[in-house]
């Protein structure tokens, strides 16, 4: 959520920047009217409160003098009713202002290139050379089925489309990838591993920005009876959601920052709006595993932290010897809450292209303001909002796809990357 003071004092400038850099049309007229009315109600409630307090004191003085206090009592009661009405109207208006503010995307950093869509993203670097094959390349679906490890038909029977059943050595390889990523990030990159709930409440989803705007992308639980919103849950679309919300409503000592957390979880997404896209294989699933990286940092450290976090995700690809490229997303392709995002795209031989395998974002104070996540300096004891960052380190299913396709042999076997062999009992090939 953007700084309310920014919306109050620089509304036109913010609207202009959002339109130019995000293509987002801010409802300036409504915001301006709401702010004008808020100021009037604020003054009115403060005036009524002061007058009621003054009259209440007069009751005591009049009573001490032996005077009739009933007229004053009636006046105080009338003032109280007016104050309650004004407060209720002010509360309702502030909720309306907040509801509108929750739909406004974050402002892009000035270093982010202008652009309407992914075609205008900026390639930053490439690592590794795509392998040349002297045989017909198979895709991961064919390779996985040849190994008896990917069963999409069974998943359709159990659940439906965009799910998979993994078996045997393919399931083991999938597990090995996640374990390798966790060990790397915890033992070499300084992250603390966390086990988090896969179901979260609505307040948590508001905190990281999935609600109210992206509710249709979530899988929600449906209580059998009407219950309060606080008791309704949704499956997590990413471990970013529970990990980041661990600092919600907290005041952290600045000396304890950065906080670096990682978790391996399944992720659940409805893929609303993705009908007909990537219908074959593991690329776009309703349920997939991911190792997530989250950092909570001081505001002045967040841009450097983004570079560091992205490097941590890149290290996974480099150790697996998977060719990839690093892309800086343009303003039109960035996520709702991000101020700057790098995508890592891995080479997939069967598609003859690079595909996203990680997205690393600096959310600035956008999530922290929603969550009221703050830090306090030991020197002056003042509090300020933290900055939050997140990234995939990596998407496990897509990494499995990349390993299957990049390490395939002419006979359909899959060579196990060297760094994964200790997790596979020394196995060198699958199939």
Swiss-Prot record:
ATP-binding among keywords: yes
InterPro entries: aa-tRNA-synt_IIb (IPR002314), aa-tRNA-synth_II (IPR006195), aa-tRNA-synth_II/BPL/LPL (IPR045864), Ser-tRNA-ligase_type_1 (IPR002317), Ser-tRNA-synth_1_N (IPR015866), SerRS_1_N_sf (IPR042103), SerRS_core (IPR033729), tRNA-bd_arm (IPR010978)
Binding, ATP: 269-271, 356-359
Keywords: Aminoacyl-tRNA synthetase, ATP-binding, Cytoplasm, Ligase, Nucleotide-binding, Protein biosynthesis
Catalytic activity: tRNA(Ser) + L-serine + ATP = L-seryl-tRNA(Ser) + AMP + diphosphate + H(+); tRNA(Sec) + L-serine + ATP = L-seryl-tRNA(Sec) + AMP + diphosphate + H(+)
GO molecular function: ATP binding; serine-tRNA ligase activity
Main localization, broad class: cytoplasm
Iron listed as a keyword: no
Residues reported in the UniProt entry to bind L-serine: 238-240, 292, 392
Broad EC category: ligase
Pfam families given in the database record: Seryl_tRNA_N (PF02403), tRNA-synt_2b (PF00587)
Localization terms from the record: Cytoplasm
EC number assigned by the record: 6.1.1.11
GO CC, alphabetical: cytoplasm
Domain-related comment: Consists of two distinct domains, a catalytic core and a N-terminal extension that is involved in tRNA binding.
Similarity annotation: Belongs to the class-II aminoacyl-tRNA synthetase family. Type-1 seryl-tRNA synthetase subfamily.
Role this protein plays: Catalyzes the attachment of serine to tRNA(Ser). Is also able to aminoacylate tRNA(Sec) with serine, to form the misacylated tRNA L-seryl-tRNA(Sec), which will be further converted into selenocysteinyl-tRNA(Sec).
Name of the protein in question: Serine--tRNA ligase
